[in-house]
């Protein structure tokens, strides 16, 4: 079974840098899907499995830390190379970022 699709599941704490990471991935040619509704994850998986659209060959799916386990479980075992990029930051860094906004 040849894997031709790559999915990076980007998750982490709010304010840790997910948006920065997805911008970099977009510059690398990934199609970015941000805050995809978790209730539609089954439809997303079905679409990815059958799609021949080249835009869906490289996908970065950004999700909240709360929804991460659901997406991770649903993406496990599909015909794609799935990687996880979990971004974290210390409490002091997160507090400083929130103070500056």
Predicted segment positions?
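Phosphate-binding P-loop
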Residues: 1-4
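Conserved phosphate-donor/acceptor-positioning beta-strand/loop module used by diverse small-molecule
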Residues: 80-101
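Conserved glycine(s) of the Walker
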Residues: 16-17
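Walker A (P-loop) ATP-phosphate-binding motif of ABC ATPase nucleotide-binding domains
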Residues: 7
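Conserved nucleotide-sensing/catalytic segment adjacent to the nucleotide-binding pocket
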Residues: 32-79
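Hydrophobic anchor at the beta1->P-loop junction of P-loop NTPases
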Residues: 10
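Post-Walker A alpha-helix
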Residues: 21-22
